[in-house]
Amino acid sequence: MSQFDWKRADQRGAFSSLNRRSLLRAAAAAGVVPAAATLGGLTNVSVASTLRLQADPATLTIAMNGSPSDLDPHSVYDYRSAMPLRGPYEGLIALEGSATDKYVPVLAESWKANDDKSVWTFTMRAGVTFHDGSSVDAEVVRASFERFLTMGLGPAGAMRRFIQDPAQITAPDERTVVFDCGEPQPLLEAYLSSQYGPLIMNVPVAMQNETDGDFGHAWAQLNEEGLGTGPYRIVEFEPEQQLVLERYDDYWGGWEGNHFDRVIFRVISENETRRQLIEQGEVDIVDNLTPEANEALAANSDLVIDRSYSAEVDYLILTEAGPLATPEARQAMCWAFPYDEVIEGVFRGYGKRAIGGVSELVAGFDPETFQYTTDLDKARELLAAADVPEGTELVLTMETGYEDVKAAAQLFQQNLSQIGINLSIQEVDLSTFTGFIFGDMPAEERPNMMAWFWWPDYNDAYNHLYPQIACDQWGSAGTNAGYYCNERVQELFDATRDEPDPAKYQAALSEIQQIISRDDPSAIYYMQRQWTTVLRNDIEGFVFNPINIGTFNFYTMSRKGSA
């Protein structure tokens, strides 16, 4: 075991018993988090002053249906937390506009690969500073990736496909960063454009706030002071209430032209309240409204509704423990789900049937993947074969604020009652829910089902599936919240990671998709969602990207006539 392996083993021990909720509680107990976390020496923005700021045309206000639960870019793996982080944090490169396979320079001004794409070299942009004024050079970029990989949380599993040891990343001079993958890795470029994980942090500042060997993680979950390079700084974070970004005057991109000075995120869980706020002009952007709310807003000429299919698949995680421990029991759940009623009756055309666990927009999707229908007789037979008796109690846990998902769960509840299964639906706040998804409690202590949705970090089916179902992605290591583990699936993942032959690569991905859908279900994959974003019609510069779902490039957005 290398020095890195020993270090990583020690750190995984430190992190494995923690989840985001426990870290937040620990930070609060240590006095890190006042009632409203205030950053950068600025005072809290009161409700009254928030309303005044919203009236400022240079302020963009977004109503979110749930609160960010984490501000550390090296652990964030949910989109509500990722949404504001596009303001303060940047990567080496990014996706270009709405493209899923074209890239633009950000902190790196240029990059190239050797002939077999096993070594990638990035030249850093000159003159970039962190928000504390310190320079961004190749060494601090290397240190940022070392922190990310060594912590080993959430999105780090995606990077370990390409880089297993931080020693594979070097900084031979002040402006050059080299990634030596050891094997041909043509997808490293795609990975480094992701909004989850490969973002550059000012590690020396984080380490000044280290506690018990956590790399400053507990502090960075609630603070961004001096850590980022982006056009905006986080100046206030009041969990479950609001988060405020203000522009960083010394941003390397400059401030010529029309830009927002401030971005306010208001946490409004009630669907009807968010709809009223966008109608009344009290907020500029909302998403995740119900189909009924979107239809009610369609005739409003003051609003623009963007409807775009994305890389997202919606599903119910099936925990591989207790009554659902066997493939037969999980197959029964898949046969019992009311697919047509949910798609047509609940989502009203804002989604379509998923074909397995991968969106049709993602490279590696197999359209021949097995697709269930609703058949309660088959479900009943499979439950009997799995020795799951009538009267069995199951719990489905979901995040509050998703009225459409709740309606779908209630229809499922009705179907299960017809075959003798009692399903309880439990709604919890985002922080509690991400504790279930990313926490490390045993499978036996988890809900039997969890309503979740997922899209890839970059445009690749392997990446889409690996965090959800790989045996080493349980709990805080990824998003395998059901503790699924299939030996054949893991064998295919391990054999295919570096597969250079496109045909063999696709064959392995197709087999994985069939196994998790038909033979040994990991989840009930029921819908490919049509993502909707409602904007006031004076907001310019919004571009939907099917991979970067639920985030906004605030720097290129503006308000008409406010220059």
Residue ranges, per PLM feature:
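Aromatic- and charge-enriched surface segment that lines or borders ligand/interaction sites
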Residues: 109-154, 172, 178-180, 188, ...
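Structural transition elements
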Residues: 232, 352-385, 400-407
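Gly/Pro-rich hinge or "lid" segments in bacterial periplasmic/extracellular proteins
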Residues: 96-98, 195-255, 262, 270, ...
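N-terminal lobe/hinge region of extracytoplasmic solute-binding protein
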Residues: 63-115, 146, 227-231
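N-terminal secretory signal peptides
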Residues: 1-22, 26-37, 44-45
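Detector for C-terminal structural segments
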Residues: 29, 33-44, 80, 238, ...
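Ligand-site clamp/hinge motif
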Residues: 220, 250-296, 422
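Surface-exposed binding/hinge segments that line
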Residues: 123, 158-210, 236
